[in-house]
Amino acid sequence: MAFSFDLAVILQRERRRTKRRRRDLCKSRQPIPEIPFDLVIEILTRLPAKSLMRFKSVSKLWSSLICSRNFTNRLLKLSSPPRLFMCLSSSDNSHLKTVLLSLSSPPDSDITMSSSVIDQDLTMPGMKGYQISHVFRGLMCLVKKSSAQIYNTTTRQLVVLPDIEESTILAEEHKSKKIMYHIGHDPVYDQYKVVCIVSRASDEVEEYTFLSEHWVLLLEGEGSRRWRKISCKYPPHVPLGQGLTLSGRMHYLAWVRVSDNRVLVIFDTHSEEFSMLQVPGDIFWKYNGLLEYGGKIAILNYTKVDIEGVMELWVVEDEEKNLWSSKILVVNPLQLQMVNSIISLTVLGTTRNGEVILVPGPEDKTVFNILLYDLQKNHIRKIEIKGGPDRYLNNIWEVVGMDDVENLMYL
């Protein structure tokens, strides 16, 4: 009994000592200094986008900060590792299935052969039946006939654009209709816009002319989700291939008349005005592509690469005077086989370091690979893409873009 009493006394004394120590500790403890908000912002900008998306749930303040335009723009200025985007398509019971995959681009190297492994599946259920046309600043455009969607590859947000209900050409039952969607950015008002060019051949067979309409939609802010028709003082035209955005302006090749030479159309995303440049007459429209060269818009003509091993680069030097410069590129004979082994090529643009991205056409289904052509070193390297589903090897696949931007903008 005495033992139990002594134990109770000891436990009671120990509890008192514990409470006293806690009380003394609380009195001596210094308050934790508050982290300056500017430092919080600096720390957040150094985190990957996936972490930022999770941290939105920390508090309303953090959510507002991460979703704010100033914070988003700050992230855009910080280059992320470039990523390649692949679109794989297969037809099952007349239904088109689309798979969107992503992989890190290979590092700079003089090695002729290397590989890169697919590490992300970005497919969303709403993408079924759509084809990816291009990617710009973390935003991807998906098209199915006259319908379009915008997909943020960082936030995984997929938005369906409204139909252009007021379009006369789209309302017509005409077989030769062509529709091109393109994402652009107005650097003055910091606005993202989607441009849509709708065109078709005219009914005047002897004239071989076209009809075209031009529409613009704001992706955010006042007036968003509504198409506006804009005027063009130049003749109606039909776009040839996808456009390229450079310095706040969209560029694309087009036909004005079937029998005429091609033109380079320039659309200023801020002023929403068009201009046209006559393309040099010996450029064949089917085997060329737009790219950036030294901060200028250029056309790479690869019509003769498989026969003579040469490409021709045309660079816009002066738009007002329609002045172009040209440069002949002779492919290294030891690397020519890499080009000749591909049935058809498409110019997809350039990497961050200026290498031209050459993508095999849909006829080449045996292996996933691309070519990177360094114009300065005259060096071609082949990048084999590994990790793709084998079931798509006998169907349509294509690399649809390269981008080095993580965009947290809410659509």
UniProtKB/Swiss-Prot annotation:
CDD domains the UniProt entry points to: F-box_AtFBW1-like (cd22157)
Positions of transmembrane segments: none
Domain F-box as annotated: residue spans: 29-75
Superkingdom of origin organism: Eukaryota
NCBIfam families reported for this sequence: F_box_assoc_1
Identification of the protein by name: F-box protein At4g19940
Species in which this protein is naturally found: Arabidopsis thaliana (Mouse-ear cress)
